[in-house]
């Protein structure tokens, strides 16, 4: 049985890493490609677990020797996925999940148009701002300049949502995890005929509702909030008031999520 290549992308702070972590607990046979990066570890991150941390010089050497399937520069740091991850997953007949940004996703889709692409959106700028501030606080200092830079970049990234096959809005963690799981199981069913038992109809319905072309009405308030639809401009985005409250919908969110 051939493995499926899944791509998942999201603006920084959208909770993507948490979704991936929960998916791997609930669905077997999904390999996770650990990216290489030149950024320093955050918090409790460990080399070889969340990322393979390396120097800019070593990253450039790997780039020069064609090690990477895709690579990108994000917020001044380099990220890349090694080709070896895909080769090993294919050899084992496993699915492979790439947690990569919109630049890297575009590169992979150009080479492998059969890949299943998933984009994760935060519900609105206020929630994203809270998440980014909480992460900054977890690192020991609230850098408002960095928070706003990432908020503005998020709007630009969300503009690329039409390039993805599936769209998730990560407003309620359990629901978003269930949707991600349904997408993986539905793709296995359609591509490989994998049996999903008594849950089959419900799983297929949940996945179908997340297809980009079925999501326009569901996404409309999110796109309007980020100034992508309607009259709201980038300069008019409402990022909310200062708040020390945690985002109640994301108790399990990983503060290290890129």
Give the residues covered by each predicted segment.
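ATP-dependent small-molecule kinase phosphotransfer cores
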Residues: 35-96, 102-106
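NTP-dependent small-molecule kinase module
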Residues: 156-258
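Post-Walker A helix-loop "phosphate-sensing" segment adjacent to the P-loop in P-loop NTPases
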Residues: 25-33
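Walker A/P-loop
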Residues: 17
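ATP-binding Walker
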Residues: 14
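A glycine- and Lys/Arg-enriched "phosphate-lid" helix/loop adjacent to the NTP-binding pocket
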Residues: 39-44, 90-95, 107-162, 166, ...
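P-loop (Walker A) phosphate-binding loop of NTP-binding proteins
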Residues: 9-11
């Amino acid at each position: 049985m051939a493995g499926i290549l899944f791509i998942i992308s999201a603006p920084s702070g959208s909770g993507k890493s948490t979704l991936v972590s929960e998916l791997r607990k609930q669905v077997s046979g999904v390999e996770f490609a650990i990216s290489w990066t030149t950024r320093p570890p955050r918090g409790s991150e460990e080399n070889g677990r969340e990322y393979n941390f390396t120097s800019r010089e070593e990253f450039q050497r790997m780039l020069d020797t064609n090690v990477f399937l895709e690579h990108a520069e994000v917020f001044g740091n380099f990220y890349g996925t090694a080709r070896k991850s895909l080769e090993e997953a294919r050899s084992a007949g496993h699915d492979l999940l790439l947690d990569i940004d919109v630049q890297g996703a575009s590169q992979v889709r150009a080479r492998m148009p059969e890949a299943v692409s998933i984009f994760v959106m935060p519900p609105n700028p206020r929630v994203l701002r809270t998440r980014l501030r909480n992460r900054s606080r977890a690192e020991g200092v609230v850098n408002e300049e960095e928070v706003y830079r990432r908020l503005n970049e998020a709007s630009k990234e969300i503009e690329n949502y039409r390039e993805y096959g599936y769209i998730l809005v990560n407003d309620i963690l359990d629901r978003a995890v269930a949707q991600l799981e349904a997408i993986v199981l539905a793709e296995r069913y359609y591509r490989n005929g994998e049996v999903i038992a008594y849950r089959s109809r419900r799983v297929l319905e949940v996945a179908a509702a997340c297809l980009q072309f079925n999501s326009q009405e569901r996404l409309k308030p999110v796109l309007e909030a980020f100034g992508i639809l309607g009259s709201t401009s980038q300069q008019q985005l409402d990022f909310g008031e200062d708040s020390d409250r945690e985002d109640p919908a994301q108790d399990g969110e990983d503060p290290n999520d890129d």
